A protein has these predicted regions:
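Hydrophobic anchor at the beta1->P-loop junction of P-loop NTPases
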Residues: 38
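The conserved Walker
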Residues: 42
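Conserved nucleotide-sensing/catalytic segment adjacent to the nucleotide-binding pocket
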Residues: 60-115
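Hydrophobic positions on the alpha1 helix immediately C-terminal to the Walker A/P-loop
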Residues: 49
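NTP-dependent small-molecule kinase module
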Residues: 22-31, 56, 163-215
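Conserved lysine of the Walker
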Residues: 46
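A glycine- and Lys/Arg-enriched "phosphate-lid" helix/loop adjacent to the NTP-binding pocket
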Residues: 120-172
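Extreme N-terminal, non-catalytic leader segments
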Residues: 3, 9-33
């Protein structure tokens, strides 16, 4: 039976599972949750959701940026990065907040039992990203390993944070539906959430009792 979220139809809610793509599916149908991979453009709320999921399930939140970026924004060499992440995903439980597909391929999502795609509207993610970045820049907030936001890194060039966020948002919408409907993900629960409200409702229905081995 297909049900909406709350009292409104959840036409934008999709779950990919063993029965294929199901629009408007009940988020309570998610199976045992122990390894969660979260994907989404910058500003979509990955870190916030990962923190909440990790606390709810009693597993660590793995912030991949903190592993990948060393001091002065140096990047860990790809072979070393992949080896480190292979160790991470071999653990019994975790919530991982970035996929890094260009360097890791499908390593993280294929190791997960549940994949959450935060597909919020671009204007929402960009507004959130602008507020977050401005706050970090003004307060000189340390991100990872002594790194802080710079205006050059945020605003200028094709590799700027905003350009990157827009490109990833468009790329995900173009490629992820076909990817997650493919045979490699038939044993996964893949949840596509398109609003903050859907995120809250889904999180409320994923409790520690759904963790592997729970009563």
């Amino acid at each position: 039976m297909t049900r909406g979220v709350g009292t409104q139809p959840a036409r934008s809610w999709h779950i990919w599972g063993q029965t294929g793509v199901r629009a408007g599916s009940d988020p309570g149908s998610v199976r045992a949750v122990r390894r969660v991979a979260i994907i989404g453009a910058s500003g979509s709320g990955k870190t916030t959701l990962a923190d909440a999921m990790a606390a709810r399930l009693g597993v660590p939140h793995i912030e991949v940026d903190a592993i990948h970026h060393g001091p002065n924004w140096t990047e860990m060499p790809t072979p070393e990065f992949r080896a480190r992440m292979e160790q991470v995903v071999a653990a019994d439980g975790w919530v991982i907040d970035s996929m890094y597909q260009q360097k890791l391929g499908d390593l993280v999502p294929l190791a997960a039992d549940t994949i959450v795609w935060l597909d919020l509207p671009l204007h929402v993610t960009m507004g959130r990203l602008a507020r977050r970045t401005a706050g970090c820049y003004v307060r000189r907030t340390e991100l990872w390993n002594g790194n802080r936001e710079t205006l050059r890194g945020v605003l200028w060039g094709r590799d700027s944070l905003f350009a990157w966020a827009i490109a990833r948002h468009r790329e995900y919408r173009r490629t992820l539906p076909a990817t997650f409907a493919g045979p490699a993900y038939r044993d996964k629960d893949v949840i596509r959430l398109r609003s903050d409200r859907e995120v809250r409702v889904w999180l409320d229905r994923v409790s520690p009792s759904r963790a592997v081995g729970a009563a």
